[in-house]
């Protein structure tokens, strides 16, 4: 299995190691740089891994036998340490001076630090690598324990078994409705009524909103009796008696205003004297003319009249009907300039 080598021959120990590596190499051609033998043993199939493990065990036995052989043993031990350190990394190996020490402090963590309960030294497996499964399981257990201590937002779950039934809910609802109906029947026998002062306006405010829509020009001292809002039953009886007495006194005054027999007799004498001795007054002549004119207008035949804009469209707010009503109202002068009801003659 030895190949023809150009140059000085290697020592016996290195030659055997080289032959073992040649056996482990894949006979198929590879384009590009070849991976180290240890990486190939990790990425190959189970059969290759078994062969690699057997070859590594043989190399270990040979190295143990040649521990006392001088520089060869040191070189082999150094190569084995380099292979163990470089396992899991791609690319060129670091020089021996840059090798990470076993007792070196942990690398600084960038970002917020975990609570003290979450910090745990990572465990290593048989090959010297960190086992992420154990660390993740530890974190999951810690998170579960810490989650129980956190404040719970929202309704708390029931502490005991919940006994809910649709039938019982319907029965309770029917019972509440029955009680409501029975109580309503009892209350109907006693109707609730409001007092009169809550539903009726005071006498002074009966015509509220029907009066003039202007402000008062003068101060009104007679603001009205507002004691109706606070009257007791005794006050109402007292006021009712006062109103009856006031009505009686008012009726007595009306009786006094009635014309006496003397005034009536004198009025008849004056009217007979005026008819016989005096001529007809201007007021009487005016009334007679109005009556005759009204009779003529009534008997007059109505004819078709031409279109009048003011009358037909009622442009002017003061139309003919309002004009006639105003004239008719001004004719009744006797209501303003007539004699009084009592004491007609001195």
UniProtKB/Swiss-Prot annotation:
The modification Phosphoserine is found at residues 28, 104, 136, 141, 146. Residues 1-283, 289-308 are annotated as: Disordered. A motif (GPALPP motif 2) lies at residues 32-37. The modification N-acetylalanine is found at residue 2. Residues 106-115 have a biased composition (Pro residues). Residues 60-69, 142-152 have a biased composition (Acidic residues). Residues 123-132, 169-193, 233-267, 293-308 have a biased composition (Basic and acidic residues). A motif (GPALPP motif 1) lies at residues 7-12. A motif (GPALPP motif 3) lies at residues 91-96. There is a cross-link at residues 277, 314 (Glycyl lysine isopeptide (Lys-Gly) (interchain with G-Cter in SUMO2)). Disulfide bonds: none annotated. Keywords: Acetylation, Isopeptide bond, Phosphoprotein, Ubl conjugation. A motif (GPALPP motif 4) lies at residues 111-116. PANTHER family: GPALPP MOTIFS-CONTAINING PROTEIN 1. This is GPALPP motifs-containing protein 1. The lineage of its organism: Eukaryota, Metazoa, Chordata, Craniata, Vertebrata. The gene is Gpalpp1.
């Amino acid at each position: 299995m030895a190949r023809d080598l150009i140059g000085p021959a290697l020592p016996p120990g290195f030659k055997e190691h080289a032959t073992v590596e040649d056996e482990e190499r894949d006979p198929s051609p590879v384009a590009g740089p070849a991976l180290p033998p240890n990486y190939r043993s990790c990425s190959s199939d189970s059969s290759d891994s078994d062969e690699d493990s057997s070859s590594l065990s043989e190399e270990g036995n040979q190295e143990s036998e040649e521990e006392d052989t001088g520089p060869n043993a040191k070189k082999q031990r150094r190569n084995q340490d380099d292979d163990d350190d470089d396992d899991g990394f791609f690319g060129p190996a670091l020089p021996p001076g840059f090798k990470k020490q076993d007792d070196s402090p942990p690398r600084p963590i960038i970002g917020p630090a975990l609570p003290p309960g979450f910090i745990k030294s990572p465990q290593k497996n048989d090959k010297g690598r960190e086992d992420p499964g154990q660390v993740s399981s530890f974190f999951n257990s810690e998170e579960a324990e810490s989650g129980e201590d956190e404040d719970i937002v929202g309704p708390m779950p029931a502490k005991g078994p919940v006994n809910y039934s649709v039938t019982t809910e319907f029965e309770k609802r029917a019972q509440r409705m029955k009680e409501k109906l029975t109580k309503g029947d009892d209350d109907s026998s006693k109707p609730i009524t409001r007092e009169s002062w809550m539903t009726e306006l005071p006498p002074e405010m009966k015509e509220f909103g029907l009066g003039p829509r202007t402000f008062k020009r003068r101060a009104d001292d007679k603001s009205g009796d507002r004691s109706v809002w606070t009257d007791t039953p005794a006050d109402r009886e007292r006021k009712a008696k006062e109103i009856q007495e006031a009505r009686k006194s008012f009726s007595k005054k009306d009786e006094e205003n009635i014309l006496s027999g003397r005034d009536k007799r004198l009025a008849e004498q004056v009217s007979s004297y005026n008819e016989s001795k005096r001529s007809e007054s201007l007021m009487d002549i005016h009334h007679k003319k109005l009556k005759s004119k009204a009779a003529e207008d009534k008997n007059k035949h109505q004819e078709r009249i031409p279109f009048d804009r003011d009358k037909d469209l009622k442009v002017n707010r003061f139309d003919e009907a309002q004009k006639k009503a105003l004239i008719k109202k001004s004719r009744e002068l006797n209501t303003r300039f007539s004699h009084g009801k009592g004491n007609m003659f001195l």
